Every structure is written in C-alpha cells, then in structure tokens.
A protein has these predicted regions:
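Conserved, structured core segments of small domains
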Residues: 1-129
Length: 129
C-alpha cells in the first residue's frame, strides 16, 4: 500500500529555523539524509522532497473573474506543507511507525522536533490492495 507522509508546519515554526544554531541545522539535515537513505535501501521509499517556503508559492486557479495566479499559500491556511515522503509498505501501522520516526528529527539542542506528520493512503494504491 502506498502512503504519503506530509510534514506540515506553521510560519512561526519555520521562522524559528532562522534562530537555530548551525550545529542544530546540520544535525537535522544529517538525520533526514540518513533517514531517507535507510528508507531507500529498505525498498519502501518511492519519492521524497522538501519544499520551498510558502512565500515562494503560487496558487493557480482557472480564472473566472479573478486572478488566475496569486502569491503564497491560501491566506486562511495556518499550516503549510514543508515536505513529503511517498512510501510503499505492507500496512498502515508500518506507515505510522515511519511517520513517527520522521517526527523525531532533532531540533535545537538535539531534542526531537516533534513536527506533525500527516499520513494518508494514496487512493490509486488502495484499489490495488
């Protein structure tokens, strides 16, 4: 079964990154690199990407009496997508285990960042299981 694991955050959480020490940032990047490598080598990783900050996003609509392209994420959004993993695992429980490990990425002082990871089954995969 395929799942998407979505790391979300608020603007305040990501503004917080600017205050992290270089060592703390390097520790988090090293964790993510090792985590992704482990998923890839175990054969469960389909794809993973980190995303640019929301200020760089564009929202595109069909038009119809409005601007078809606007800056940023939806203004009413409190959270935004920071990155994702697509995994192919045998059970929802395995997807939850992997999501919990992703949430353990170190934050300042090496403490787990506890970032929320939303887990959703990919619909096309649901019909094949």
């Amino acid at each position: 079964m395929k799942y998407i694991l979505m790391m979300t955050g608020t603007k305040a959480q990501f503004d917080w990154y600017a205050k992290w020490s270089r060592q703390d940032l390097q520790a988090q990047f090293a964790f993510m690199h090792a985590f992704n490598k482990e998923l890839r080598e175990s054969g469960v990783l389909v794809a993973t990407e980190g995303l640019a900050f929301p200020a760089e996003a564009k929202v595109v609509r069909a038009g119809l009496n409005g601007e078809p392209i606007t800056d940023g994420v939806f203004p009413e959004s409190k959270e935004f997508l920071a990155g994702y993993w697509i995994i192919d695992v045998e059970s929802p429980e395995r997807a939850y285990e992997i999501a919990a490990r992703a949430s353990m990425a170190p934050g300042p002082g090496g403490q787990p960042s506890n970032m929320p990871i939303e887990v959703r089954q990919i619909v096309s995969a649901a019909s094949n299981s």
